[in-house]
């Protein structure tokens, strides 16, 4: 168990069995949302009270161990290896998320876009546009955007370093005040005041222990391979957990991995903002952008960024994905091509859409409508009226959209 002697608090909160069980029921609902028809959820629900009570006792007794994960390959939007936790472990992940999400979020910069409520790709594109407008004096002055990418990010996260970063962050935040204006789930019987600290509403001894259990888990240990071995043909060895150094990699597919991807690179975000003093910067997972009027200044940051990532986090900057573009010619970021006063769907995103649309089964109207609706939703935030008409205004998809008049009225309107 991790030491927590430096948690300087006068009234630390201690998690009770009743509270943990209550929170596990809430975490179950989070994990099962939209999946109640899945066989593994139904099986767990058959003995829900018993299963959650057993899980509660394991967590309180510090005997909890994750079950082997399922490993398989997905091809969209690109080929990658996924490790999916068993359903009971996903409940634990959602419990951890409920306990720590708002704590970790307070440590992030405003321009971290992924896996944060109220942010995402659209928010990231809006912030990129905001930074460009500021740096270019509303598109009037010369300005450059430099995009950066990390090679095989999830496969090269050092779990020992991550554990150190996460635990130090939790310990530091335990002393911070929660804030009465924030909607924070509180334990039963706890009242929030202006002076309440996080350590008075969260059991940090429990959180530090659970952090270690989740971070240090080796996904390869006794994992269950799903699919044919040939599914792995053509997968870059740098993106396959069998070929990475022991102690590296987080399982793509787990909720906690999404949280930790931000926790790990928050160190880099702080370096860019505070040490490099880059005012105009944003990051979505491992894709980041730096904007500045001075092209030479941006180029001068590349070796500094490369050295910091390697020395502090053991990560390698993808040399082939460093791009500098004059912003008036357009900047591609998060599937969108941003130009002065307008945005377009990027060519790569459009190619993926067209490929997926070829696989849509038009005989299943409801499922097909969901697919079409998702793509139209993406396109609706860009200058794409003619593109939407060409893809969905005629032919088989037009007949499908005629089936839903509201969709036709909303998405095919100029």
Describe the role of every protein-language-model region.
Residues 1-53, 413-414:
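Non-catalytic, polymerase-adjacent accessory regions of viral genome-replication enzymes
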Residues 67-69, 282-286, 319-320:
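Short Gly/Ser/Thr- and Asp/Glu-enriched loop/turn motifs at secondary-structure junctions
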Residues 131, 136-285, 289-304:
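Conserved polymerase palm-domain catalytic core
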Residues 1-14, 180-197, 407-414:
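Intrinsically disordered, low-complexity and often Lys/Arg-enriched segments
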């Amino acid at each position: 168990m991790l030491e927590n002697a430096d948690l300087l608090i006068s009234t630390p909160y201690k998690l009770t069995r009743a509270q943990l069980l209550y929170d596990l029921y809430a975490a179950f609902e989070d994990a099962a949302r939209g999946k109640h028809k899945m066989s593994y959820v139904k099986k767990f629900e058959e003995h829900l009270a018993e299963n959650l009570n057993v899980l509660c006792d394991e967590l309180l007794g510090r005997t909890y161990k994750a079950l082997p994960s399922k490993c398989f390959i997905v091809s969209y939007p690109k080929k990658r290896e996924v490790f999916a936790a068993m359903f009971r472990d996903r409940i634990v992940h959602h419990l951890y998320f409920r306990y720590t999400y708002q704590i970790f979020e307070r440590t992030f910069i405003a321009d971290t876009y992924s896996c944060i409520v109220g942010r995402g790709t659209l928010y990231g594109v809006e912030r990129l546009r905001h930074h460009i407008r500021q740096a270019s004096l509303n598109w009037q002055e010369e300005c450059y955007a430099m995009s950066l990418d990390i090679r095989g990010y999830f496969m090269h996260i050092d779990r020992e370093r991550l554990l150190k970063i996460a635990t130090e962050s939790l310990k530091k935040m335990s002393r911070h005040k929660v804030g009465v204006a924030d909607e924070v789930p509180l334990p039963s019987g706890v009242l929030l005041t202006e002076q309440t600290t996080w350590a008075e509403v969260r059991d940090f001894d429990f959180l530090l222990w659970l952090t270690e259990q989740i971070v240090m888990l080796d996904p390869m240990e006794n994992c269950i391979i799903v699919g044919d071995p040939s599914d792995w043909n053509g997968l870059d060895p740098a993106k396959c957990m069998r070929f990475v150094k022991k102690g590296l990699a987080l399982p793509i597919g787990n909720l906690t991995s999404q949280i930790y991807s931000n926790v790990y690179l928050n160190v880099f975000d702080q370096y860019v903002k505070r040490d490099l003093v880059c005012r105009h910067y944003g990051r979505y997972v491992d894709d980041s952008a730096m904007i500045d009027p001075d092209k030479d200044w941006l180029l001068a940051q590349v070796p500094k960024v490369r050295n910091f990532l390697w020395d502090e986090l053991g990560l390698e900057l993808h040399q082939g994905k460093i791009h500098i573009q004059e912003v008036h010619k357009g900047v591609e970021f998060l599937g969108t091509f941003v130009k002065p006063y307008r945005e377009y769907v990027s060519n790569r995103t459009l190619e993926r859409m067209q490929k997926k649309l070829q696989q849509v089964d038009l005989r299943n109207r409801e499922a097909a409508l969901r697919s079409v609706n998702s793509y139209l939703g993406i396109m609706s935030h860009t200058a794409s009226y003619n593109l939407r008409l060409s893809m969905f205004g005629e032919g088989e998809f037009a007949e499908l959209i005629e089936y839903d008049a509201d969709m036709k009225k909303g998405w095919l309107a100029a």
